[in-house]
Structure formats: C-alpha cells, structure tokens
C-alpha cells in the first residue's frame, strides 16, 4: 500500500468543560503525529478546538487517524462517514482512551484500533501496510482480518518518552495572536509531560487502563528543553503538567524542580499530585520556588465512607491536615471531587463543599461519578449505567442511577455546588483576605463554570422526565426495577455497545 500522507484529527467536545476557554494542544495526538512525521511521513494534524478541519486536505490523505474522547465519538463517527462517502477505501485508525477501553465497539467504525499508547504501535502499523503485510504480530491493536475481529496482546508500555512535540504540526496553532485570544475569550496554556503512569488504583479512575501503573520518567534535559521550546514558540508562561502524579518519584521530581529553579524559568505551572506531597517540606519548598504554584489534588470527598469506597487511602482528617500544610507554603490547592457514589447522600455532598470552603481550598472541579460499563463495575454496577449516546461521557453529566438520590438531584447538586463555591460572597472573601489575584482567578473560574452549570441544569430537567419509576419517595433507588441487565448502558445509533440489552428504557435529551 502506498502511504505517504497521514492526517490526524481530534474532534472538539460537544459541551462546555472547565477548559473550554483554554487554548492548548492536547498532549497525546500531536506527540504521535510528531513521531510519525519523524518516521518519514507527510503529516497534517487538526485539533478542532484550535482550528477547523480542512476537508480538502483530509481527502487527499493516504491514511486518516482519529484521536477521540468518549464525548467526541458521535462527531468522530460523523466525520468517518463523510470520509467514507468520498473515499470508501480510505484506511481509518482510531486511538485514545475511549478506543483503548471500548476497542471492539470502536472497531465497527474503522479499520484498526490503537490501544493504549501509540508511540510505537502506530508507526509499526503504517510500516506493515507500506510493506503489504498483515498486522498479526503487531502488539496493541484490534483490527479486522477478513471480516473477523482480531484482538492482539497488549504492547508493553513505552519507556522512551523524551520526544518533544512539534506544535507547529497542528494546523492553525500559530494563528492565535494575543488580540485574537482576547477577542475569542481564550487563554493559552501549554501542556507538559514529565512522566507517565500512576502506581495507584483508585476504583473510579481510568488512567491505569490507558497509561498503565508502571511509572516512567522523562529525562530532565528533555523536559527543560521542552519548556524552553514552548515558551519561545508562543511566548506564554502558563503551563499545565499533565502527569497523573507529578511527585511519585520524589528524588527525580526534586532534581527537575531544582533544575527549573537554576535555569530561572519564568513560568506559572499547575501539576497533578496527591496528598502525600504534604509530608515532604523540601518538595513543597521546591514547588513554590519553581513557580509550580497550584497543586491539582484528587480530594474526592470530605466524607470518610465515600473515601473508603473509592479506595483513596486517605480520610477527612488527613485531607484537612494536608491542605493546611500545603497552603502554609504559599501554594494553591485545586481540589477535585467525585460526587454520587453509593456512600454519598445529598447531605454528604453539601458538607463536602462546605468543608472545602472552610478549609480555604482555592479552586475546585466537580465530577459526577463516571466510567465505562463493565470496566468501572466495582464503582458503578453495570445495571445502573445509562448512556443513550457517548457525548454525555465528558465528566460533567450523570450517566448512572445513584443509590441515594435521583440522577437529576445529583446533576443539580453539581450545579449548586459550583454556584456556592464560586459565589460573589466567596470572591469578596478573597478580597477581604487581600488575596486580589486569587479573587480575580475565582471570578474567571465562576465565568467558566456558569456554562457548565447551564448545561448541567438542562440535563437535570431532562433526567426528571425519565427517572421517577426507579426511585421511592425518599429518592432511594429501587434496585428490583433494574434486573440483571438494568437500564441500557449505551445506545448509540448503529452501535454494538450493549447489544442484547433489550430493555432500553432511558433515552437521550
């Protein structure tokens, strides 16, 4: 097969999220595009929230590769149909979290699914096709073989993660001038990866399935070069470190932080980490000096029963102590919370938000419990999922039947919690504390979450029309109404997901 032109497409998400107003090049797809370009192919990359897909260029491709989040699967399928209508024989490849978890379901729309990391797998697939060889010995793929689905063994996780992404491969990336950013109400954020994997196994988290629990570190020299490259390219100082847990290997993190300090890198960064970071004073001091000023931490809840169910290995007392310690070093805490587990009630959710305010958590991100049918069964039983379409699986919408409240109630609690945390009263509180920059950032967050709240309330209105038969007068789930297969875990037009689940009782809004 003649393969020279390879095009990558990442469709936009259909609903607002906490990063809707951020302009950034999502990490995975542009990196894989860079690796494929370096392997000798003519590469084009379209990230739709940066710029529109240029379909004339897509149709001239030899292979089209999609990176799709679950919420963008419906759009991805539309785009694939558009390509197939014009180029019926165009080879199409899908990758990303959704494809990794739902490989066989995703395969119905494409020729090959790249599972988990694509750094080595995609170049190998392209090389095999160039040589007209089959994919029988390619690890990490699910593909069609004469009408049969082949699911090859997983590929060992990639250890060479030092490649610096060429951001100029992304069509339109350099077209965002400061006036355009201001006009479109967008703010540049650069993404940086210093490691992959997470050694923890929280029951609700998909990261171990996608990137593995084997923790791999990028070389310090490569990280520093990447920071400098991105700063020089676009002139911004705002970075988000996308590692699942930036401080897992404390010795490595400290070497990197000291190097950032020594290099006098002028930036402002956010990183993901865990509460354990609070036990290391030197780490906290280095984070502050290295200008990684906000720690994004999965607090999840201030209710001990919820924390135990989620396997977080932390309790309310340890969270409060850790938050106080982190903030004493002048660092901000962005706490994320998972709402709606079987140990959650309306009262426990409200107490969690009240405690977050009392503990002076600086920012928060709220997520109704989510996941994939079967994979997240320990946290959400299979018979309690309902997803009429994948577009609601973006972390903001309720996609299951909670045990202790109706779905609409949980959806409205998300909206109300955002409203309370980012209220004018709380912004004024920051001003009284003379935390002027913090007040300004809270105001910015309030504007962003307003869009989420609007979509959340609309979803709640719909849920109210279809949930009643499953709950008693105290909003307790009547599990006998569900049966073994329960409500439909997903019904997407033409989808095989949930095939055989005839009792599709919940539709879409």
Label every model-predicted segment.
Residues 2-8, 37-42, 57, 89, ...:
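Radical SAM enzyme core and accessory elements
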Residues 4-5, 32-160, 368-374:
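Glycine-rich beta-alpha loop elements in corrinoid/cobalamin-binding modules
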Residues 5, 63, 112, 236-238, ...:
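Residues at the N-termini of beta-strands
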Residues 12-13, 138, 144-194:
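N-terminal [4Fe-4S]-dependent radical SAM core
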Residues 15, 200, 251, 305, ...:
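Flexible glycine/acidic-rich beta-alpha junction loops that bind and position SAM and/or redox cofactors
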Residues 103-108, 343-358:
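Catalytic cores of alpha/beta
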Residues 168-334, 341, 354:
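Radical SAM [4Fe-4S] cluster-binding motif and immediate context
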């Amino acid at each position: 097969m003649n393969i020279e032109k390879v095009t990558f497409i990442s469709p936009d998400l259909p609903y607002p999220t906490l990063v809707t107003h951020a302009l950034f090049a999502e990490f995975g797809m542009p990196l894989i595009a860079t690796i494929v370009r370096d392997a000798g192919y003519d590469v084009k990359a379209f990230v739709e929230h940066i710029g529109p897909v240029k379909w004339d260029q897509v149709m001239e491709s030899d292979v089209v590769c999609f990176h799709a989040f679950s919420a963008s699967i419906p759009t991805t399928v539309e785009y694939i149909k558009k390509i197939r209508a014009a180029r019926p024989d165009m080879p199409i490849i899908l990758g990303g979290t959704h494809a990794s978890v739902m490989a066989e379901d995703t395969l119905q729309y494409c020729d090959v699914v790249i599972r988990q990391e694509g750094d080595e797998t995609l170049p190998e697939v392209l090389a095999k096709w160039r040589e007209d060889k089959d994919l029988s010995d390619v690890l990490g793929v699910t593909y069609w073989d004469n009408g049969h689905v082949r699911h090859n063994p997983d590929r060992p996780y990639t250890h060479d993660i030092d490649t610096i992404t060429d951001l100029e491969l992304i069509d339109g990336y350099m077209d965002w001038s400061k006036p355009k950013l201001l006009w479109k109400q967008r703010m540049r954020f650069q993404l940086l990866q210093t490691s992959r994997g997470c050694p923890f196994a929280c029951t609700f988290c998909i990261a171990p399935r996608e990137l593995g629990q084997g923790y791999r570190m990028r070389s310090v020299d490569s990280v520093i070069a990447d920071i400098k490259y991105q700063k020089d390219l676009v002139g911004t100082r705002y970075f988000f470190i996308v590692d699942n847990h930036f401080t897992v290997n404390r010795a490595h993190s400290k070497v990197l932080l000291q190097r950032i300090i020594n290099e006098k890198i002028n930036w402002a960064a956010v990183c993901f980490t865990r509460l354990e970071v609070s036990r290391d004073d030197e780490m906290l001091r280095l984070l502050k000096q290295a200008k990684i000023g906000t720690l994004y931490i999965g607090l999840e809840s201030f209710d001990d029963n919820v924390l135990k169910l989620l396997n977080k290995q932390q309790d309310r007392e340890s969270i409060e102590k850790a938050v106080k310690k982190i903030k004493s070093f002048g660092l901000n805490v962005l706490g994320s919370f998972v709402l709606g587990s079987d140990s959650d009630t309306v009262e426990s959710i409200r107490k969690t938000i009240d405690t977050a305010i009392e503990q002076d958590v600086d920012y928060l991100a709220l997520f109704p419990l989510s996941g994939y049918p079967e994979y997240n069964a320990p946290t959400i039983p299979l018979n309690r999922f309902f997803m009429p379409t994948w577009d609601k699986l973006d972390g903001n919408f309720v996609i299951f039947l909670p045990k202790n409240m109706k779905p609409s109630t949980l959806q409205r609690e998300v909206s109300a919690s955002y409203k309370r945390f980012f209220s004018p009263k709380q912004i004024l509180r920051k001003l009284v504390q003379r935390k002027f920059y913090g007040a300004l950032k809270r105001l910015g967050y309030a504007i962003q979450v307003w869009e989420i709240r609007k979509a959340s309330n609309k979803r709640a209105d719909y849920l109210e029309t279809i949930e009643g038969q499953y709950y008693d007068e105290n909003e307790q789930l009547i599990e006998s109404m569900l049966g073994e297969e329960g409500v439909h875990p997903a019904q997407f037009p033409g989808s095989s997901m949930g095939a055989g689940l005839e009792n599709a009782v919940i539709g879409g809004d």
